Structure formats: C-alpha cells, structure tokens
Design a protein with these regions (language model features):
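Short hydrophobic helices that act as membrane-entry/anchoring signals
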Residues: 277-307
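PAPS-dependent sulfotransferase catalytic core
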Residues: 1-89, 103, 107, 117-142, ...
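Short clusters of hydrophobic/aromatic residues that line enzyme substrate/ligand-binding pockets
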Residues: 53, 159, 255-258
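The conserved 3'-phosphoadenosine-5'-phosphosulfate
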Residues: 164-281
Length: 355
C-alpha cells in the first residue's frame, strides 16, 4: 500500500485501486463484483459502482473520499489487490480516461463484451421493467426503439470505441477482454482469467452459491416474456451492425458470429420498419440527443473546474508535494500533471489499439 504526504507534511495511508471493471453495462458486473469479494487477495470498494470519475461523485467528493472506499475494516487496506467495478466508465470520453491514466498509470482494466442485441435488449428490460415498473410486453415498439437510440445506450454498445480509448490511455496489455458467454457457460474459466490479469492467486474456484446464480436475471425481476419483438431486434441489428463490424476487425474475427447473425437479422426488413427507423432517428430522438450533448458540454466545464479545485486543495505553497502524484512530487510535477490533465490531445500514452 502506498503512502503520500498530507498538506501538513505528514505521511498518510493511501489505498488507491489497482484494477477497475469498466463494463459493459448488462454484462454480469454485479455477479463479478460479488464473486471477487470472496477472493482472499482482493479488497473491493465497499459499494459496487463508485462512478467517481464519471460525474456526480467527482464533483462532490475528493480523492481521499474515493480511496477511503478501498480501505480494509482495520483501516490499513492490507489486501494487496484493490478495485472497483463501474460499468458506466466504458462510456467515458478519451480525455477523461487519459486523465485517469495520469492518476493511476498502473491500473489494470477489465472489460466484458456481450452480444450487442442481447445487451441492448437486457438494458431495455432493466430500464422499462425493473426501474420504471412497467410490463415490457405493453411497451410500444416506438418507445422501445427510442430507448435503443438514446446516446448513452448506443455508447454502451460501441465496444470498439471503449477498447480504443482505454488501450490508448493505458496500453493494450493493461486491458483484459472477455465475453459474457464465457461468464455464463464457464464461470471458473472466466473468473480465473480476470484473476490472472489483476495479479490475484490462481487457480481459484468460484464459490458454489454463485455457480447457480442467474446474472442479474431480468426475467425474475420483471416477470414477463423476454423474447425480443422482431421489429426491435431488427432495429438494434441495423443500428449496431457497423460498430460490431469495426469491433470484429479490431479483435481479428473473434466476434464474427455476432456480425453474421446481425447481418441475417438486418436483412429481414419491411417498409414499415424502415419508416419507423427514419422517423425515430430524424425526429423522435433529436430532442433527447440535443439535451444529452448540451448536458455533457456543461458537465465537462464543471469537471474542468473541479480539477482546478483539487489542484488548489492538494498543493501547498513553495515546493511542497502534491498528493495526487505521491510523496515525492514537487510543485513543478504538480503543474505538469494538471496541465496534462486539462489538455484534450488525442493519441496514446503508450502502446496502440491492436488487439
């Protein structure tokens, strides 16, 4: 466990995370969090989704608050491997991820991918059924495809974008990619792959109580038929086929079956579906898209000012160290860090996006 200097010059204990799960949403992250909590080498954050680097938490809390969530019960953070799982991190922009890499350059990244149609539909079930308490069977096709079209949902399914942003920032060796199908069909192999990547002891057997646990089973939460309406299935395939083709190129054919299946589904079309697609994309979804973009422009400005506040909070006069960069950071390194954090320059810190 690392140490750093407080603003008074005293050494204080730090428990920064050594790994983070970045999604994707609806890909078994709750199940993985519960399983990893049982491993003797690992200290998970005391709540599953910290979301610190995304928006609200970072705006209202500092790094001391964040790191405190990784402390052991005795306050010493004795377990060598610490992490959090926040699937929403997969939607972060490149400039945000680059800044995380400045803070935590040795972070190990876990990413789980699920068939895009299954993932998008699972999210629809969650949002309409579990969160809104509606019977999805009674939700209109228009409402369902509008939900698919939402910017945040499309970002969660654009796996190539996520992979490129995070591997550019941390280097491709830092990123562990696996599939929801393996989690579902062979949990031991899936979990041990994660453990090896983050440096935990292997082999390790998944506790028996988790082998029969459905992964956030939305059918039990909502109580409805989970069959995807044909028009919704076609709409998702039409919307996500090109991003999935780009993903397949990046992964050198590892998701060819997804591409083939989505091409078949997309080919089964009719005029009314195509009309619905155009109306949704050019009319119905426009207000939400504009509102989303405007909100995030404002959020970026607030985050920028938040980092300025963190700088003032942790930097003392003269050559005192800055907590963000550890015990031997100087005021010069502080300025270098902050200026680098503000810049939104493209390009990898190390490595490239080849997988």
């Amino acid at each position: 466990m690392g140490e750093s200097l407080s603003r008074k010059g005293n050494f204080v204990r730090r428990c920064p995370p050594t790994f983070v799960g970045i999604g994707s949403l609806r890909c078994g992250s709750t199940w993985l969090y519960q399983v990893l909590k049982c491993h003797p080498d690992i200290r998970l954050s005391d709540r599953k989704e910290m979301n610190f680097f995304f928006m609200r938490e970072m705006l209202h809390h500092d790094l001391d608050w964040y790191e405190a969530h990784f402390e052991a019960e005795d306050g010493l953070g004795s377990r060598p491997i610490r992490g959090e799982i926040s699937p929403i991190y997969g939607r972060l922009k490149a400039w945000q991820v680059n800044r995380i890499a400045k803070l935590l350059p040795d972070l190990r990244i876990i990413l789980t991918l699920r068939h895009p149609i299954e993932r998008a539909w699972s999210q629809a079930l969650l949002e309409f059924g579990y969160l809104d308490g509606r019977d999805v069977r009674k939700v209109s096709s228009i409402d369902l495809v509008r939900q698919v079209e939402r910017a945040r949902n499309r970002l969660s399914s654009d796996y190539r974008r996520t992979i490129e942003i995070w591997s550019n920032a941390f280097g491709q060796d830092a990123l562990h990619i696996d599939f929801f199908d393996r989690l579902r069909d062979d949990p031991d192999t899936y979990v041990n792959g994660v453990l090896r990547h983050i440096g935990a002891t292997t082999p390790w057997t998944v506790p028996a109580q988790f082998m029969k646990t459905k992964v956030h089973a939305t059918n039990s939460l909502v109580g409805h038929n989970r069959e995807i309406p044909e028009v919704v299935q076609w709409y998702i395939a039409d919307r996500l086929l090109k991003p999935t083709e780009r993903l397949n190129e990046l992964l050198k054919g590892r998701v060819s079956s997804w591409v083939d299946e989505m091409r078949i589904i997309r080919g089964k079309t009719c005029l009314s579906w195509r009309i619905l697609r155009e109306v949704n994309r050019t009319v119905l979804s426009v207000p939400e898209r504009l509102a989303y973009e405007a909100y995030h422009v404002g959020l970026d400005v607030r985050l920028w000012w938040r980092w300025r506040h963190l700088q003032r909070s942790y930097v003392s006069n003269g050559d005192s160290p800055m907590k963000l960069n550890g015990p031997r950071a100087t005021s010069k390194s502080t300025k270098d860090f902050v200026s680098a954090y503000y810049r939104k320059e493209p390009g990898a810190r190390k490595g490239n996006t080849s997988i």
